[in-house]
């Protein structure tokens, strides 16, 4: 049994890797391609049944995926765009859940309003991985990606809270609006507090205990599970616990990790996140047999009609919400008009169109209990089918059309000039490096050609000379080589100090800061590995 399960997992990982390579070859976003591939594979006769356990999704997959997203999100950018992020991740989630609740209640016979809120809570959160993977490499404003990623960090929590409140209402038969509101904010705020508390403990562990790159990497994998399980144990939001803790530790990462830890952690996490996302999306497609089970109470025309109507309305709801939420605050508040550039309607439409649903929706639908008060949960199979169609409909229609839509709308990147920021960043780093050389190695600059060459490069505001520079000097002494390497390592340290000053000044985009940190990590790794 164990052998069979292990073989199944390895086969699944292999298939995910192969299909992802194929998606890169044909130019289709891999989440969309994997869902379609999984759907086609499910039709193959004799294929084993892949059951997606919602407990596995929420406990095994969701914490690291959320933590990885939070880790790669700039807190500065998240806070800067907090208004549109919260309007989408909380306001739009509640609006979508409410709209779908009343629509399904009116359209489907026997579908109560509470059942409608269960369905609305299930399908309300978009999946950012699908959207950002489509947008990757396309010419869109950076703030669009930032807002979509920020939305995804919070909307899962909002939708799951709505989902739980709806289930509780069906179980008790009672719903009090003010109590639901209090519960909503209590669950959210306490989840954030628990996440930050655990993050502070982990910060102290990383900062003051002797660790190695392997230990640091292991702790980063343990962290999201600690945050999620602790919050869920007390019936608070595990999602927000992971997100808040991940944002805090990411913001403090430069204080905690050595260059070896940063490099190892980044490489390992990139691989793990890719595999988890790949498994999740192909498993969505493989769920068709499970979804079709139990639909005997309805005709095929009925279930398809319900699912397509809900899918179309779900897309329209986002469009209807996004445009007023973007422009009305600008009309009402002068401060917003002064601080933020006016977004074009094309850019706003891209945000509105990037509402593809994903694994959280399917896992929530599967988490709907089989029994309610001793009898079968009403319309559970229909809720599951509608959710599957909404996921497939939005992923295929919106996901495949998004690149062409961006080209057709001729969207221009009107964000701040990152090239200018990058030039300034290089200039600042070159300046502090040159100052350090002249203060501490002035004699060597006058005596040795490599020192003079490096000084000239900094003077011209170019990158630090490659570590192999001293390898080409065959006639220099071992002492010179060691001293030259020592100087380069010291300059890297000086550059890191300047980067932290720039981070505090908020003079550059965080993405540029992180890229530069990785470059310095690679430079240091090459130097320390040199004989």
Region locations from a protein language model:
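Transmembrane helical cores of multi-pass secondary ion antiporters/exchangers
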Residues: 1-418, 483-484, 499, 503-516, ...
């Amino acid at each position: 049994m164990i052998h069979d399960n292990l073989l199944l997992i390895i086969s699944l990982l292999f298939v995910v890797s192969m299909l992802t390579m194929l998606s890169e070859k044909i130019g289709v976003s891999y989440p969309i391609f994997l869902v379609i591939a999984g759907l086609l594979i499910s039709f193959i006769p004799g294929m084993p049944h892949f059951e997606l356990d919602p407990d596995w999704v929420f406990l095994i997959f969701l914490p690291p995926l959320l933590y990885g997203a939070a880790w790669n999100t700039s807190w500065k950018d998240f806070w800067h765009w907090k208004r549109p992020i919260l309007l989408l991740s909380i306001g739009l989630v509640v609006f979508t859940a409410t709209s779908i609740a009343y629509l399904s209640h009116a359209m489907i016979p026997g579908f109560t309003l509470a059942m409608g809120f269960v369905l609305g809570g299930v399908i309300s959160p978009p999946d950012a991985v699908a959207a950002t993977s489509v947008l990757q490499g396309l010419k869109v404003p950076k703030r669009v990606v930032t807002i979509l990623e920020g939305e995804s960090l919070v909307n899962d929590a909002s939708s799951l809270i709505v989902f739980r409140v709806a289930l509780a209402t069906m179980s008790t038969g009672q719903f009090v609006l003010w109590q639901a509101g209090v519960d909503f904010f209590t669950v959210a705020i306490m989840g954030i507090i628990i996440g930050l508390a655990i993050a502070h403990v982990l910060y102290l562990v990383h900062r003051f205990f002797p660790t190695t790159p392997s230990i640091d990497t292991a702790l980063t994998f343990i962290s999201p599970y600690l945050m999620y399980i602790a919050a869920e144990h007390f019936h608070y939001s595990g999602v927000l616990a992971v997100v808040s803790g991940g944002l805090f530790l990411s913001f403090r990462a430069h204080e905690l990790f050595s260059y070896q830890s940063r490099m190892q952690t980044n490489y390992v996490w990139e691989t793990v996140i890719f595999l988890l996302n790949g498994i999740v999306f192909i498993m969505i497609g493989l769920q068709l047999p499970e979804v079709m089970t139990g639909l005997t109470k309805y005709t095929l025309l009925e279930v398809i009609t319900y699912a397509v109507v809900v899918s179309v309305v779900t897309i329209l709801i986002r469009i209807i919400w996004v445009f007023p939420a973007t422009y009305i605050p600008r009309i009402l508040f002068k401060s917003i008009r002064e601080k933020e550039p006016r977004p074009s309607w094309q850019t706003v439409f891209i945000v509105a169109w990037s509402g593809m649903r994903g694994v959280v929706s399917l896992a929530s639908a599967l988490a709907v209990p089989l029994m309610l008060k001793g009898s079968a949960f009403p319309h559970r199979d229909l809720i599951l089918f509608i959710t599957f169609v909404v996921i497939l409909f939005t992923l295929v229609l919106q996901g495949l059309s998004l690149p062409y839509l961006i080209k057709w709308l001729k969207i221009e990147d009107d964000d701040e000039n990152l090239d200018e920021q990058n030039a300034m960043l290089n200039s600042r780093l070159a300046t502090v490096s040159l100052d350090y050389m002249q203060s501490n190695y002035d004699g060597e600059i006058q005596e040795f050609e490599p020192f003079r060459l490096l000084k000239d490069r900094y003077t011209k505001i170019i990158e630090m000379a490659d570590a192999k520079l001293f390898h080409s000097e065959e006639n220099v002494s071992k002492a010179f080589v060691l001293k030259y390497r020592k100087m380069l390592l010291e300059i890297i340290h000086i550059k890191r100090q300047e980067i932290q000053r720039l981070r505090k000044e908020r003079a550059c985009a965080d993405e540029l800061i992180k890229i530069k940190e990785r470059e310095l990590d690679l430079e240091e790794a090459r130097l320390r590995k040199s004989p």
